[in-house]
C-alpha cells in the first residue's frame, strides 16, 4: 500500500512477510515486494509545490483512517490521527494536508528533482523491494516527463 514509510516497511511489514513465508516453507525469493511510492517531483518549483500539496493531502487522508494508525505509531505521530479523523468527519479535506509537516512528507514520499528520483528510491528501497509503485499528484506531466525517471530506475 502507498501509505507506508521505509521505517514501517523494514521494521513491521518485511518481518511479518518473512514470518508468514517461513511458516509456509517459503522464502523472500518466492515473494515479490512492491514498494510504497508517493513521489513529489516536477519539472519546476511550481510543479514540485503542487505535487507536495497533493501528496500532503493524500497522506492526511490515509492518516485519518484508523486502519493505518500503526504506520503513524512507529514514528510517534499517533496523536495526529485523532485530529485528522475529526477533520475528515467535518469534511475539511483541503485543510487536513496543512497538518502534514516536512518531516512527515519526507518519511512517506520521495521528494526529489526528476533527475534524482531514481537514486533516492534506490537509496531507500533498493535492497528490500522488487518493484516500485509511483503515486504522484499535482499535475499530469505525461510520458515524456516520466520515461527518463523510469529508465533511470531500471538501469
Write out the residue ranges for each language-model feature.
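Active-site-adjacent structural elements that line small-molecule/cofactor binding pockets in enzymes
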Residues: 1-155
Amino acid at each position: 500500500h502507498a501509505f507506508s514509510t521505509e521505517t514501517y516497511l523494514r521494521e513491521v511489514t518485511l518481518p511479518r512477510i518473512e514470518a508468514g513465508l517461513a511458516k509456509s516453507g517459503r522464502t523472500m525469493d518466492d515473494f515479490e515486494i512492491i514498494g510504497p511510492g508517493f513521489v513529489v517531483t516536477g519539472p519546476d518549483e511550481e510543479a514540485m509545490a503542487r505535487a507536495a500539496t497533493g501528496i500532503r493531502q493524500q497522506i492526511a487522508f490515509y492518516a485519518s483512517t484508523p486502519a493505518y494508525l500503526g504506520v503513524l505509531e512507529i514514528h510517534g505521530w499517533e496523536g495526529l490521527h485523532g485530529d485528522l479523523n475529526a477533520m475528515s468527519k467535518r469534511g475539511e479535506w483541503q485543510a487536513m494536508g496543512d497538518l502534514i509537516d516536512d518531516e512527515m512528507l519526507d518519511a512517506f514520499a520521495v521528494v526529489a528533482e526528476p533527475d534524482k528520483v531514481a537514486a533516492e528510491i534506490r537509496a531507500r528501497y533498493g535492497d528490500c523491494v522488487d518493484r516500485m509503485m509511483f503515486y504522484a499528484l499535482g499535475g499530469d506531466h505525461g510520458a515524456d516527463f516520466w520515461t527518463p525517471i523510469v529508465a533511470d530506475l531500471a538501469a
